[in-house]
């Protein structure tokens, strides 16, 4: 690519003024194939317009979660939570990304107690005192996706359940802190797994984070276990989710054979999850949705 050509990232800037220096640095890094190290594909690296689009989508997504935080309580059915999010997103010109995604029937996921993820909202599922609840919301605005989830503790939650929720949030925060430009995806999982195991919890391995922004799910897959200095290289312009699912019991999960969406802990133990959408910058990270 010539210096005066338009950059491959779609910024409409000359290559020399955009990603030339980036490419030179990227190509100078010697990767170790035996550690699964690899360069990211160009199509997952966002330009300034993309980042601003995801940021705006994240503002709506955050607003939906803030609204739910102000309303959620014992006695509320999970379909009401779904409608709160759906209506908020639509009223702000967004689209609920989950609705009809690969056949998913609702606008958000609401996962209670031993449900690890993908709980389907229903009038028949009513929150009770002592429940721990994950609400997972993804918004599309002008073609850009932002994804986040939060845990809510309903009424008088047991000390054991409260600790699981708190440690899971710490796992997410530690995972985000491990993200460094020119580091590796494995750096995230290594610290998350260490922190979870320190508290005698397990990390769900079947599911994880993912690239996000132009699509709901992009490369890379972000495992919340593993070893440092392995996997895809993390570079400025990548956007991904950090969303550890931490179980009080064993890590194994099962899929509901009827709805084919809801995922439970195999042993019936409690599970918790927190999620943020994270941009990798030249100097660290920026949270785009939380």
Model-identified regions with their sequence ranges:
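Active-site neighborhoods and metal-handling regions in enzymes and metal-associated proteins
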Residues: 3-4, 11-290
